[in-house]
């Protein structure tokens, strides 16, 4: 599958333990706010495929724990994959997000030293415009809510940053997350959050 063409696009939203804005979002060489950076990237796929395997409407969450300087590597990471995904769809998602299919995750995979066994779980995804939410019952819940800009109408945004997974415009947000997975147990409240529309190919 790694030699097959693929594309994927949709919504990406994140929350981590840093205060807004996470220093590592500007550069992995920056030092994060605490002794470790813990958080997630959550994805709702609008459209995507790996060869003839369609990925439309599926969700995946990447939960991570990294040292204070993310560029130093030694991340621990796990995938939560939507239980609606068939086995070929799960294989395709793992291929993309592990970096084995090329694309942006091939870069991020170099920082991961401990990839844990994927969890296949029920997911509930909600998008109400300025607020994005994903729930895995009894295990994981995250919400990010956009920060209003100075004009009182549009959201505050970041743009023209070098970032391999986000789209060109990142909406600033406050996030909250509760994770009670057996290997990740943390609670975040009003910390760094972002969301954007992503598009990748490989």
Protein language model regions, located:
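N-terminal ordered "arm"
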Residues: 2-48
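Short, well-ordered strand-loop elements centered on a beta-strand within folded domains, enriched
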Residues: 7, 32-39, 53, 71-80, ...
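Internal, well-folded beta-alpha domain core
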Residues: 57-202
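Short, positively charged
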Residues: 37-61, 175-177
